[in-house]
Amino acid sequence: MIKKENIFRIFLMFGFIVLTVFAVIRMRPVETGILSGFLNPQNELQKQLIELSAISSSTLNVIIESQYSENIENAKDELFNLLNKTNIKKDKFNSDRLLEIYSKYPNNFISYNRRQLLKNKNYKELSQISLEQLYNPLEFFIQTPDKDPYLFATDYVLNLQNPYFDTFNNTKEFNGKYYSKIFLKVTNPKTLNKDLKTLIKFQQKCNKKEDIKVYLTGTPIHTFVTSHKSSFEINIICIISFLSIMFICKKYFNSLKIFIPILLSISFGLIVGYLTTIVILGQMHVLTIVFATSLIGISLDYSFHYIISELKNINIIKSLTVSMLTTVVAFLLLLFSGVELLKQIGIYTASGLVGVYLFVILILPMLKNFYPKTTGDIKLPNISKYRNILVLVIVIVSIIGFCRIKTSDDIRTLYIPQKKLLQAEILNNKVFKMPEIMFITIKGNSVNKIIEQEELIGDKLNKDGVLYFSLAQFLPSAKRQMENRQMVKDLYQNNLYNYANFLDLGTKNSLKKASLKNDVQDFTKNNNDVLKNFMLDKNTSYMIVFGKYKPLTLGKNINQIKLADNISQIMKSIRIKFVKILPFIFLIYFILLSICYKPLKAVKIISAPLIASIFAIGFTSLIGQQIDIFHILSIFLILGFSLDYSIFMANGGKESKDAVFISFISTFISFTLLAFTSFKLISSMGIILAIGLLTSYLLGLAFFLKKE
């Protein structure tokens, strides 16, 4: 007859296999975009924020510096030959096709200033400007004067040049040196690391020469350098943490074999959490994996407690079950947060905890061959007599910290670039005078309608002398082209014969006759390359406005977006939402613990995690850090760990002290090491997590372990 435990084990393995199969079917690549974890793609504005951020994040700039322009041109040629072998391409559309259209239909393309002269029928001033341009020996012509006597096409192209984009040329002189800026675009993120290594080798090769220097700017290079350094640091931390756990196992159990079942329980919990999240949501965010590391600490906690209880013949199933249920219910509450990242963390952690719990009570008993015969005995100081002093210090520090508390939702404060990268960005701003950027998104039923809206906005910006970059500048709407042709028709009727003395009568007559035609260019039918540079989707375009500019009064389906400001506003609202969720989590803890134990004991168990969370925020504020969304998220991790400590200390007493200490010290070492990483986001989280765990553990000792 099959034992009841074996039946449960069979069901567990069968469920794991089914979960794996469904996960493989549903699996999509891990989401790495930070914003997509917080923003809702169903919200139109937030969807546009994600897309615009992705566009900005794919832009890479190469700045070449030299005293001689010839050296710069040679370096550019070498760079372009190198880029042909990569998926980093020059961010420039095919201008030859546009110039061909402009030259063929010059009457369709008229700059804002000349349109104003035509509208006001100020033909005298228009004639004067055109003649000055015509007889300028340095002038070039897009179309010859016999076909475009007022040089509309030439003037139109000249007005397309933008100092902030490489429309035609972007070389400047600064402090006695020449600087050329090449705009590049990442076309395939999968090969980005390989391609950037090629680009960095080119930079290093050029920088070895005396007469040339290359700088790299833009999000991709910052991400590459920071992620590589952070990965190296985190790998070192993982190795140290791994070795510390092995050392603890050897020291306490006098055996390394015990490490095998512990490692299996951790792995099982992490895998179950991952598979469940994939089955339910189809995809996982990289930040979910980071924040769900609480499973590792809890897995250690459960495993150590179970193994030590078996060796000491103590029954801790109730404590394990209560710990699992309270934590699972609390994390499931995150499903109602409305934030994608919190939903994923809730599902991952809750399902992973259930997986760890089932593995510990069903599978660990089968691995007794790996158990040691004896355990050590950890002597802990009796700090219960200092409980009042400890609480007083915590309260004072918390009060002072909260009095000085400052919040920050500016995503730019989460990252401090390395010195060389910072110098490159400063040089870029000094030489090329990079202004603030605002995006304007326009949604419409057709490309032509979208362009018409852009033209209305563009007229307002032109009137105020504001530089911008838009689809309508390159491809005017059919309506605007018809208006231009009508104004040129009136111009030729009233002014051509007096103005164009450099043309014979036959040419003038031909020009006048040609102006009667209604030749309008419909760019939507040609699938022009320019469209893809300005369209978020088939019904949405975006304009780029340069410099500080007051918000415009715009119509429906038009949004003004400043990436950093808009994202910061959303981060602020999410941070506030996180804070509002926390009291409900503590309430859930209290209700569940009151059911399992008495209300007074429930309060006592909750008090350590609650006080530790408050102290962690207060201490972080006291040392000068501004509280951001990631500090608040760290509180969820602190709760996951510290609640376990309290439950086991409250019910296991001295028998649980060793397991709790081993679990605590292993996790504390890992988070303390994180505090020394170079990436500010990770280091600030490491500080608050280490402080929160230490405080919670000390409070647990003071509240529950009165005698050694």
Summary of predicted features, one role per range:
Residues M1-N40, K190-T191, K197, Q204-D409, ...:
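Membrane-embedded transmembrane helical bundles of large multi-pass transporters/channels
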Residues L12, F16, G33-F38, S53-F109:
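N-terminal pre-first-transmembrane
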Residues V24-Q67, Y164-T167, R404-K443, G640:
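Solvent-exposed, non-transmembrane loop/terminal regulatory segments of multi-pass membrane proteins
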Residues P41, F93-L184, V225, L471-Y542:
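Extracytoplasmic
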Residues Q48, V391-D504:
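Juxtamembrane segments of multi-pass membrane proteins
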Residues L60-E65, L131, Y135, E139, ...:
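A short beta-strand structural signal in non-transmembrane regions
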Residues Y68-K76, P189-K197, V447-E454:
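Solvent-exposed, non-transmembrane alpha-helical starts
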Residues S510-Q560, A564-I570, K580, F584-L587, ...:
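Solvent-exposed soluble domains appended to multi-pass membrane proteins
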